[in-house]
Amino acid sequence: MGKTLVFVNQKGGVGKTTSAINLGAYLALAGKKTLLVDFDPQGNMSSGLGLARGLTVYDLLAGKAHINSVLRTTPVHNLFAIPASIDLSGATVELVDEQDRELYLKKILAEVKDTYDFILIDCPPSLGILTLNGLAAANEVFIPLQCEYFALEGLTLLLQTVKRVQSGLNTALSIGGIFFTMYDTRTKLAQEVVKQVTTYFGDKVFNTIIPRNVKLSEAPSHGLPISSYDAQCAGARSYEKLAREIVARDGQR
């Protein structure tokens, strides 16, 4: 059975979508059949993969399409995607009065979960109904953390939400890991944040740190993961290393 990882942080601009795209690409390149699920109405994952307009995850939630008709190929062999569009924002209203409204995505992905080694869900930067769907559908939570003071405050709130989900919606949910993004070696604050979080969370923190890197910012505008855009840059090497770390940890569980 495949493993579903959800990428969550209620703060925007922390590298969540960039991380989901690039880790998905490197997992696929490592021979792991991988599915990326864009569950953010902004659709940044979809545009970052150069996906054309068409059926989206909203059509699945609305019961207008079957998952096989929404699946897309990507520029990377073994990497597939379910795109999103702004229509998904309507689901937050439409699901409010529905029974089991937090379990819609879980039911959709159940049809294909055994087909993939990894499913990666990119949630919006909020803790609303869409993110709850992502948490309910996942085996593990992955938290990208930018190296700044406010990131620590947000982490506390996020972990409280995860605990609430663990106590009801998804008792099997666990913290897959925390990893640092946009790391700038020149700032003392970045070093201090890494030290504090690592001291508190121990082995939940991945060893690999993603540096601040121009190429990582450029790649989405070309509709490519960093592995296809510039595999030799520091950002690419870091995501490849982090993907290997994820696979290694998965093998130990």
UniProtKB/Swiss-Prot annotation:
UniProt KW keywords: ATP-binding, DNA-binding, Hydrolase, Magnesium, Metal-binding, Nucleotide-binding
Residues that hold ATP according to the record: K11, G12, G13, V14, G15, K16, T17, T18, P211, N213
InterPro entries for this protein: AAA_dom (IPR025669), DNA_Partitioning_ATPase (IPR050678), P-loop_NTPase (IPR027417)
Keyword DNA-binding: yes
Top-rank taxon, per record: Bacteria
Any one GO molecular-function label of the UniProt entry: ATP binding
Keyword presence, Hydrolase: yes
Reaction equation(s) it catalyzes: ATP + H2O = ADP + phosphate + H(+)
Residue sites binding Mg(2+) per the record: T17
Its EC number(s): 3.6.4.-
Function in brief: ATPase probably involved in chromosome partitioning. Cooperatively binds dsDNA, forming nucleoprotein filaments in a strictly ATP-dependent fashion.
PANTHER family linked: P-LOOP CONTAINING NUCLEOSIDE TRIPHOSPHATE HYDROLASE (PTHR13696), PARA FAMILY PROTEIN CT_582 (PTHR13696:SF52)
Family recorded in the similarity comment: Belongs to the ParA family.
Record's protein name: Chromosome-partitioning ATPase Soj
Organism the protein comes from: Treponema pallidum (strain Nichols)
The encoding gene: soj
